[in-house]
C-alpha cells in the first residue's frame, strides 16, 4: 500500500497517535491524507479524499472506529460506505475494551464487511475477547502500546 488515510481531532490522545503514525508513514515513503473530523468544509475535504485514494494502494488507519461510526460524510448518495465502495481496507486500533463497541462492530460487519476490516487490540485480553465473541472477524491482531521520546 502506498497511501494511508488518518483522522485528526476527536479525542486528543487518539489525534496524537494519528499524528505520530503519520510521521512514520511519511518517513517510509507512504503518502498520508489527514481527514479533519472537525472541519466545516466537509464537501471540499471529501472531494480531496476521493482524489487521494486509489483502489489497491490506499488503506485507512483509525482509532476507536473514527470514520466507521456512521458519519454521514463517509456514505455516498445510495448509502454505501465510501471505504467499501473504493475497496479501502480499514485498520482500526481499538484502545478501549471491545465490549463497548458491540453496535459498531455489527455496523462494520454489515456496511464494510469483514474482508476489508482489520482490528488491532492493545491488550491481549481484548484480543481474546474478539476471538471468542467475534469469530467471523478475519483480521484481528495484538499490538502493544508504544511510547514516544522527546
Placement of each model-derived feature along the sequence:
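Extended catalytic core of nucleotide-activated donor transferases of GT-like folds
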Residues: 7, 14-132
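Donor nucleotide-sugar binding/catalytic pocket of nucleotide-sugar-dependent glycosyltransferases
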Residues: 118-127, 136-150
Amino acid at each position: 500500500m502506498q497511501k494511508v488515510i488518518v483522522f485528526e481531532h476527536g479525542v486528543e490522545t487518539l489525534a496524537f497517535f494519528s499524528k505520530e503514525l503519520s510521521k512514520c508513514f511519511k518517513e517510509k515513503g507512504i503518502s498520508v491524507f489527514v481527514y479533519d473530523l472537525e472541519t466545516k468544509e466537509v464537501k471540499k475535504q471529501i472531494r480531496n479524499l476521493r482524489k487521494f485514494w486509489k483502489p489497491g494502494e490506499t488503506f485507512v488507519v483509525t482509532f476507536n472506529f473514527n470514520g466507521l461510526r456512521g458519519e454521514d460524510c463517509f456514505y455516498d448518495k445510495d448509502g454505501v460506505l465510501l471505504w467499501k465502495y473504493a475497496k479501502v481496507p480499514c485498520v482500526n486500533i481499538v484502545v478501549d475494551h471491545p465490549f463497548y463497541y458491540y453496535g459498531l462492530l455489527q455496523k462494520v460487519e454489515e456496511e464494510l464487511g469483514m474482508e476489508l476490516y482489520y482490528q488491532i487490540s492493545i491488550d491481549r485480553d481484548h484480543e481474546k475477547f474478539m476471538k471468542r465473541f467475534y469469530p467471523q472477524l478475519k483480521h484481528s491482531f495484538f499490538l502493544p502500546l508504544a511510547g514516544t521520546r522527546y
